[in-house]
Amino acid sequence: MEPEQMLEGQTQVAENPHSEYGLTDNVERIVENEKINAEKSSKQKVDLQSLPTRAYLDQTVVPILLQGLAVLAKERPPNPIEFLASYLLKNKAQFEDRN
């Protein structure tokens, strides 16, 4: 590699304000997106706190509970409460992302 090309590469790296930490433009974009998503989720949590009880339950509990009860009615296990509890615990991740 010619010295001029190496110098050009170094100036490009120096133009990036986070280059001293080794962050690329893609990583910077990802970090910015994560910050924005975190701000949105914190705003949503505040909104959930201000909702009336019925609306809060409709947005958070009812969707997973209805799905769990449908599976419970279909399978009719001998211990329905334990079945429903384990179903809710196993499937909570897919519903937490929606809130």
From Swiss-Prot:
UniProt-listed GO biological process terms: endosomal transport; transcription initiation-coupled chromatin remodeling
Residues recorded with modification Phosphoserine: 19
Positions carrying N6-acetyllysine: 35
Classification via InterPro entries: Dpy-30_motif (IPR007858), DPY30_SDC1_DD (IPR049629), Sdc1/DPY30 (IPR037856)
Protein name: Protein dpy-30 homolog
Pfam families membership: Dpy-30 (PF05186)
Alphabetical UniProt keywords: Acetylation, Chromatin regulator, Golgi apparatus, Isopeptide bond, Nucleus, Phosphoprotein, Transcription, Transcription regulation, Ubl conjugation
Matching PANTHER family: DPY30 DOMAIN CONTAINING 2, DPY30-RELATED
